[in-house]
A protein has these predicted regions:
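Catalytic Walker B motif of ABC-type/P-loop ATPase nucleotide-binding domains
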Residues: 162-165, 417-420
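Helix-to-loop junction immediately C-terminal to a conserved catalytic motif
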Residues: 49, 316
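The feature captures the beta-strand-to-loop junction immediately N-terminal to the Walker
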Residues: 34-36, 301-303
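Conserved ABC ATPase signature
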Residues: 137-141, 145, 392-396, 400
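H-loop/switch region of ABC-family ATPase nucleotide-binding domains
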Residues: 198-199, 452-453
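Conserved ABC ATPase "signature" region
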Residues: 115-133, 371-388
Length: 499
């Protein structure tokens, strides 16, 4: 189904993203592709549907054939009926006014009769479990909901090969199970060939019969899933997270040990009182109360669409509450907003605009008169950006862009750092280095609010967990109802592994 021979892809500056790579994938295979951030995984995905070379400034050599045709001899539109590609950032491929319009766009452009367009959109909605979103505005969806819509839109084209670039990175447990269950069904019932790019191996690894590990533009390892997963030393050296067997995942509670629920005695940095907020007539948050104190490392968890990003936007001053109050500590009120709070968006492209990585990291401090070359060097180094400092941020992988955005925020030394789903595009090694550095800052007073669906990250770093449910925040402590509900959600997450 996929035949790649001696593929080399070079971006501006002679940077080889893919280096003499050859690969065959047979019809009906389910292949998991993983590797360190920036190793060329997403570039390879874009070669499969013709975006490279037809819609990219990258230079391509070698041959890529899918379903018997060469990608260089077909247009991107022609390849869309053979290869469906779902990007890491779903917002970059959604443009329909409603979800139904989005799913119908591709089939309509194939010239299909209206009844078949309806049949295809209905199938895609059901397959991804988003029938309830059919009439929703795509711009008003959460990131996780957008991801599922992007997958459904690709499915409506009925491709023979489905390529997904970190499709579960922004999904909650229910969404992850729905997407992976859909992929298993599509392969089983329709013989679809599936290539999934992931850093989190447990879930996708349970479905894959083959694993590819890339490094520096080459296929380093290629073999059966169990055989590759046994090579733990190689995985560790590459910064790849070891897959957790289901029984190990179920035995690990949210907290590794009991954590006291009493506060640290310090006055809150920021306090939300009786907040009601949303984007239309129906509020997302209702009578929400939340306080974050210095030296706290707080995790905010909850389903997609629960309002976690809305909380982040309120704290960052990007959204005004419809009712209630967001009050900062009196010692911080006179500081510019960028010194009080730093928000890492889910989509790093929304906060990158300079020509080089170094300029991006220095931009904030330069404008506030806070530049410290020593601190900038430390941050660039910890973020793993030393060798990329003169590169254009827009030419980097999503994982690298995420670290550039985080470094630019840390350079301003905000009192409160908010990380909204920081795992997208990150291998475990890069993520651990950054999180360990943040933990050291936390020990010196830095307050951190982590928004994530990754419970391994929560378990390792958070001191306190808050569950956002039905528009309100609940404190999660051992023995409480919210604590039991979260662990029950984890159990449901791994049901898909034995499906």
């Amino acid at each position: 189904m996929i035949r790649i021979n001696d593929l080399t892809v070079t971006y501006r500056g002679d940077h080889k993203a893919i280096d003499a790579l050859s690969l065959n994938v047979e019809p009906g295979e389910f292949v998991l592709l993983t590797g360190p951030s920036g190793c060329g995984k997403s570039t390879l995905a874009r070669c499969l549907n013709g975006l490279i070379p037809h819609a990219s400034q990258a230079a391509m050599a070698g041959e890529v054939r899918v379903d018997g045709v060469s990608t260089t001899e077909q247009t991107v539109a022609q390849m869309a009926t053979r290869v469906g590609l779902v990007f890491q950032n779903p917002s970059t491929q959604l443009f329909g006014s409603t979800v139904d319009d989005e799913l119908a766009f591709g089939p309509r452009n194939l010239g299909l009769p209206p009844e078949e367009v309806v049949e295809r959109t209905s199938f895609a909605l059901a397959a991804t479990g988003i029938g309830h979103l059919r009439e929703r505005d795509t711009k008003g969806l959460s990131s996780g909901e957008q991801q599922r819509v992007a997958i459904a839109a690709v499915l409506s084209m009925r491709p023979k090969v489905l390529v997904l670039d970190e499709p579960t990175s922004n999904l909650d447990l229910k969404g992850t199970k729905a997407v992976l269950g859909t992929l298993a069904h599509l392969r089983r019932e329709y013989g679809l060939t599936i290539l999934i790019i992931e850093h989190r191996l447990s879930e996708a690894g349970a479905l894959a019969d083959r694993v590819l590990i890339m490094d520096q533009g080459k296929i380093l390892l290629d073999g059966a899933t169990e055989a590759i997963f046994r090579q733990r030393e190689v995985l560790s050296q590459l910064g790849i997270r070891h897959p957790e067997p289901p029984h190990e995942a179920l035995s690990a509670e949210i907290y590794p040990e009991p954590v006291p629920v009493e506060q640290n005695g310090l006055k809150p940095l920021v306090e939300m009182s009786g907040v009601e907020a949303g984007y239309g007539s129906e509020p997302v948050l209702r009578d929400l109360n939340l306080a974050v104190r210095p030296q706290e490392f707080v995790a905010l968890v909850g389903d997609n669409g629960a309002g976690k990003t809305t909380v982040a936007r309120l704290l960052a001053g990007l959204l005004k509450p419809q009712q209630g109050d967001v009050a900062w500590n009196e010692n911080l009120r006179r500081l510019p907003l960028g010194r009080k709070v730093g928000l890492l968006f889910q989509n790093p492209l929304q906060q990158l605009f300079c020509d080089t990585v170094e300029e991006e990291v220095a931009f904030g401090p330069d404008n506030f008169g806070l530049r410290s070359d020593g601190r900038l060097e430390t941050i660039i180094g910890v973020a793993g950006l030393s060798e990329l400092r003169q590169r254009n941020p827009f030419a980097l992988s999503v994982g690298q862009q995420q670290r550039v955005a985080l470094a630019s925020i840390l350079a301003l030394e905000p009192a409160l750092l908010i990380l909204d789903e920081p795992t997208m595009g990150q291998d475990w090694g890069s993520l651990s280095r950054v999180m360990d550095f943040l933990t050291s800052l936390n020990g010196h007073g830095q307050a951190i609010l982590l928004i994530t669906h990754d419970y391994k990250l929560v378990r390792r770093y958070a001191q306190r967990i808050l569950l956002l449910e039905d528009g309100k925040v609940f404190s999660v402590a051992p023995g409480t109802g919210p604590f039991r509900r979260l662990n029950k959600q984890k159990e449901r997450q791994y049901e898909v592994l034995s499906a």
